[in-house]
Amino acid sequence: MFENIESFLSNNNELAWIAIFMFAFMESFILSGIIVSSAILFSVCIFVFNMELLPLYTIVMVAMLGAHLGDVSGFFFGKTVGPTLLATKFISKREKTIKRAQKFLDKTGQYTVILGRFVPAIRPIVPFLLGISDLKAVRFYIADVVACTCWGIALTLLVTGVGSLIG
């Protein structure tokens, strides 16, 4: 699969930033993030950096923007479908567990955003769950900007570190 992406980007250099944005968004959003691996995003970023298709700061900024918009979209998706989801028979049977989880998220919501950004398995799920919880959008937004900034720094280190090993 990555060979196809690599070939596409080699033939369409001007679309490299769109590919980075798209993969960053998809790996962060609840509906696609469960399927799209962050390894694809990292591989695309490393390829674009090694082929010098974009400067490093552009790669990182576009990836951060895509990730942030994916997180915010997941948060508001949770706000939108959360009440309906919580009213389902399946969820209502687990009311005690749901209340405990909501209490935990209400206490630790902002920290959960930052932690979730660095754990690929839960990355797309955390914003959605926080959208269902009572966390205010402004608190989520600020925490997510901090999380995506820290993640962008880590992405810079990953891209340059792996890039120097390969190239």
Predicted regions mapped to residue ranges:
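Short helix-loop boundary/capping segments at the starts of domains
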Residues: L31, N50-M51
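Central hydrophobic cores of alpha-helical transmembrane segments
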Residues: S38, D144-V146
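Transmembrane alpha-helix interface/packing and boundary motifs in multi-pass membrane proteins
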Residues: F21-L41, L115-G116
